[in-house]
């Protein structure tokens, strides 16, 4: 028996449609032009094919310009790429091809792997297929039919995928012209709606199902966008990112390296360690008034990690430690700490705490180790051993809001000192699986929502805020701080997390004003997150042109002739006395050669001394990236460079002292 379908539109209006009505029918009932522009529908927020019969719910007609259409554009482009490959190289097997961040890929089984030279050929064929504007259509097949058809085509990987689909689940087959593939969908109306704003990016190897015991396939990555302008912008950012790649800069600037014997751990060179220590020193100064710096052990018995819960839910990411020698009675299992928090709770618990002592703020530049798959490692950005600028605040419920605001002020101030102006702060709320009562979460989320509103109001709109529903940790809600770099990329760095779990697990308490035991609120706080990763972000943000105060090498004194070497030594000594890191270059080379060489290693200031400068007791200053030279007296140069090389927090301190004098 037929019945009507009730649809609610974005403007709140409700209309009835006959059963069996499709999304395309609904679009046509509004206007022919809308139906022509439509690529899909969203029913209760879920994207569906235009050809799907509708059911009761909230409906939106999705056009190609809609942000949500980008996923469909990329999905359809992946299918067209697969069709192009099989047209060009018959017998090639198509395996899987998902949409990923900024693009898509497909894995292929081919006797001779693809090379980068094949990509333009595939792109040309893709444009031909798109120009055909074949409609996408969907069929539902039985498991047996799907296996029979794919087996007949020699698609053994597709047969395996069909076998993996649970019994009773529909097998959807999408056609574009005569070509078809197994796919969950949805797709747009036709291949022509993909457009031509796409590019195939690279070829890589990939094991079938990610298992090294399986055959190696060839993966082709691509990207697709709404418009050519968006594609061009994306490619520009990629080119900029490649120029700014911190791994390349690390080599050029002689900062660090990695090697096979220590996967995911950094070998810091002298200059790199200098800038790392400058960052630590800066962070340490920012904490010296409000925090006590502590140090928890690197290696702890697994029983502590069992109590914390890490051994149960994080063990696969932990490094287990046992005694190497056979001649020992100690058979206990230890682990390198992946996090500092359990150690800090032990320090808090050591001795009775009164409510009068709260908040207790502990900070540690703690070396932690976490296992990451080798394929996930990426320079300083993704490592196995790193340093956290970690802090934990133990406070009362009533102090939580003030502490979160205090943390926020510190985080924003630090980011501003490093030149990051565009910051987004988002509150992640309770997930489905969590510890703690609803009342506890209600209280924490209410407090943190008020804090979020205060952050936005105090910044007068400069700081953007938002909510991430259900994205909180299982132990409490959290703030996430995301900063935007010089080429528009976003980096999530800082966090403020409220924890109801660990204090309870470890039995941490303080004595309240009524002499009763109370569980403290524990707030986890990180600003840089990983110090190594933050340095990688800084290197890429500045393209190696680091601010003078955090530069690994601040000045090179280079002489034009040997007659100026003695004066050059005096200049270098004066600059070192003023606190700058200085090297000299008195080689018998032309000055332009020296300048070019030091520019490659991103030395921010080259102080040039010749015979005339020695006689006049002056210098010429050459800045990285500039052809101009600035002449000034030695005294002026020392004063100017020492002032510029002073860290922002020390400048503020000096200015406050001057005002108070």
Curated annotation (Swiss-Prot):
Enzyme's top EC category: ligase
Protein family per UniProt: Belongs to the class-II aminoacyl-tRNA synthetase family.
GO BP terms in the entry: threonyl-tRNA aminoacylation
GO MF annotations in UniProt: ATP binding; metal ion binding; threonine-tRNA ligase activity; tRNA binding
Domain of life: Bacteria
Role description: Catalyzes the attachment of threonine to tRNA(Thr) in a two-step reaction: L-threonine is first activated by ATP to form Thr-AMP and then transferred to the acceptor end of tRNA(Thr). Also edits incorrectly charged L-seryl-tRNA(Thr).
Organism this protein belongs to: Sinorhizobium fredii (strain NBRC 101917 / NGR234)
Note accompanying the cofactor annotation: Binds 1 zinc ion per subunit.
Keyword Aminoacyl-tRNA synthetase: yes
Subunit record text: Homodimer.
Domain TGS: 1-64
Keyword line: Aminoacyl-tRNA synthetase, ATP-binding, Cytoplasm, Ligase, Metal-binding, Nucleotide-binding, Protein biosynthesis, RNA-binding, tRNA-binding, Zinc
This protein's name: Threonine--tRNA ligase
CDD domains attached to this UniProt entry: TGS_ThrRS (cd01667), ThrRS_anticodon (cd00860), ThrRS_core (cd00771)
Gene symbol of the encoding locus: thrS
Pfam families: HGTP_anticodon, TGS, tRNA-synt_2b, tRNA_SAD
Catalysed reactions, semicolon-separated: tRNA(Thr) + L-threonine + ATP = L-threonyl-tRNA(Thr) + AMP + diphosphate + H(+)
Keyword ATP-binding in annotation: yes
GO cellular component, one term: cytosol
